[in-house]
């Protein structure tokens, strides 16, 4: 029966929307994970929600599996096509529908790139706080499907905290949700939050109402060098008290990460002269630029005087701040010097992060003394990234490295996925984080909304 589905889609939507492999040729059809994917039987590129609904209704009738794709910047294979599947790309649905300055909202289609949203908000003298390294390529739909986190969760929360309304198409072709602008809405089950983070397994998100914030009038950024992990956590504690709600980023980097990226990426420059065990990129936002800058400098002075911070560099220009952020955003350059690395996105209670990092480092080096181990992350929300490369091993050891990291994650009752999702890459380790009852409940929701199992099958569980 599936053999006729492409014909039915072509008849309903036309060749401009439905294309065959020989027509889309070398177009990217896999994400950044490096995991294998298949060429889709056809690529559907709808222009609006009605065309998404038509496509899903036909696919459901034919029991045809469909994978929704955004910017394909995911790192867990969540958007990769498996056997005999169709791909549904939302890249044409990339319009900003409305900016409502009074409500502080932006209504956008799911294929809109994150950076476009950020820039449009600034043009309206507002601010959309979600930010991550793939900002130029990732899309709002993908950010929603994975409940993206990024660099400023410490102040603004995850992607679900930036959304007021969501519109989506179910497997049946029915359109659900509402593009409302209400902060308070307790009218039954929250379908919005059910769809956010579902990795395209429950519905195709087509549009959203995003919550905008007042544009910060002042941004202060500093690069801090610290003598110990206890000093890092003390700096976090002091920053949250001394800078109040202003702390918008607290990015910690262990020395192994800092040394490796500076040694291999000559375009980066060291913010401080000496080498230290830990580094923190601290950012704070506020209202009055003069007062905020003064308060930030005074805070840094107190931290240096108390020897919590050993050395610091204050960004005196936007280019200085961008240079600091370039060091933190260096993971995008890994293919240049560690193309076969294994990467992990895990989260823990903030109080456990230091012990987790130490235990992972010790166990990895016991197994592979020559391994490059890089640890960094968003300490303010307990999310760290661990990158491991064993010289000469290629990707042959990835399974064993996975076991080491996820065993430690289970020991500390952490999450195997802080912000990247599960996809196919982490399926085997979902039980390390979620109970059998949790997974059974998720399967029940999946069966209710997608009884034929056509939406992104083989992902999550």
Kindly label every feature range from the protein language model.
Residues 1-57, 74-104, 257-269, 318-345, ...:
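N-terminal flexible segment immediately upstream of the FAD-binding catalytic core
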Residues 1-32, 61-64, 303-319, 411-416, ...:
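N-terminal accessory segments
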Residues 20-28, 214, 220-228, 233-404, ...:
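C-terminal substrate-recognition/cap domain of FAD-linked oxidoreductases
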Residues 52-66, 121-138, 175-195, 365-366, ...:
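Short, hydrophobic/aliphatic alpha-helical segments
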Residues 70-73, 133, 255, 421-422:
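Short, ordered loop/turn segments at secondary-structure junctions
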Residues 95-249, 455:
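FAD-binding subdomain of flavoenzyme oxidoreductases
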Residues 174, 427-461:
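Activity-critical C-terminal alpha-helical subdomain
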């Amino acid at each position: 029966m599936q053999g006729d589905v492409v014909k039915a889609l072509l008849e309903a939507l036309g060749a401009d929307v439905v294309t065959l492999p020989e027509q889309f040729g070398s177009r990217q059809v896999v994400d950044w994970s490096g995991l294998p994917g298949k060429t889709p039987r056809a690529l559907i590129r709808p222009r609006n929600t009605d065309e998404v609904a038509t496509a899903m209704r036909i696919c459901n009738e034919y029991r045809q599996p469909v994978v929704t794709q955004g910017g394909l910047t995911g790192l867990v294979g969540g958007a990769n096509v498996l056997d005999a599947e169709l791909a549904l790309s939302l890249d044409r649905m990339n319009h900003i529908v409305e900016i409502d300055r009074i409500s502080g909202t932006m209504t956008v289609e799911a294929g809109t790139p994150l950076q476009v949203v950020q820039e449009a908000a600034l043009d309206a003298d507002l601010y959309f706080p979600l930010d991550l390294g793939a900002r130029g390529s990732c899309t709002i739909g993908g950010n929603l499907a994975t409940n993206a986190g990024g660099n400023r969760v410490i102040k603004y929360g995850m992607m679900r905290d930036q959304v007021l309304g969501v519109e989506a198409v179910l497997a049946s072709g029915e359109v659900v949700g509402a593009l409302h602008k209400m902060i308070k809405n307790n009218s039954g089950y929250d379908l919005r939050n059910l769809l956010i983070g579902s990795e395209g397994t429950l519905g195709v998100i087509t549009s959203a109402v995003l919550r905008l914030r007042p544009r910060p009038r002042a941004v202060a950024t500093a690069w801090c060098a610290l003598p110990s992990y206890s000093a890092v956590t003390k700096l976090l504690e002091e920053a949250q008290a001394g800078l109040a709600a202003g702390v918008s980023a607290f990015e910690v980097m262990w020395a192994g990460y800092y040394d490796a990226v500076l040694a291999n990426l000559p375009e980066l420059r060291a913010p401080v002269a000496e080498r230290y065990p830990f580094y923190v990129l601290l950012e704070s936002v506020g209202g009055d630029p003069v007062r905020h800058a003064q308060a930030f400098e005074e805070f840094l002075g107190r931290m240096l005087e108390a020897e919590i911070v050993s050395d610091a560099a204050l960004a005196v220009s936007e280019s200085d701040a961008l240079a600091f952020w370039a060091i933190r955003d260096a993971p995008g350059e890994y293919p240049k010097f560690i193309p076969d690395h294994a990467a992990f996105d895990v989260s823990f209670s903030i109080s456990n992060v230091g012990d987790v990092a130490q235990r992972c480092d010790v166990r990895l080096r016991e197994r592979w003394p020559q391994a490059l181990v890089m640890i960094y992350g968003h300490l303010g929300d307990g999310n760290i990234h661990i990158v491991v490369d064993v010289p000469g091993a290629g990707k042959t050891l990835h399974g064993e490295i996975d076991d080491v990291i996820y065993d430690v994650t289970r020991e500390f009752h952490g999450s195997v996925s802080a912000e990247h999702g599960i996809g196919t890459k982490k399926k085997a380790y979902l039980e390390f984080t979620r109970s059998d009852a949790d997974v059974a409940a998720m399967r029940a929701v999946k069966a209710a909304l997608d009884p034929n199992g056509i939406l992104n099958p083989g992902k999550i569980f």
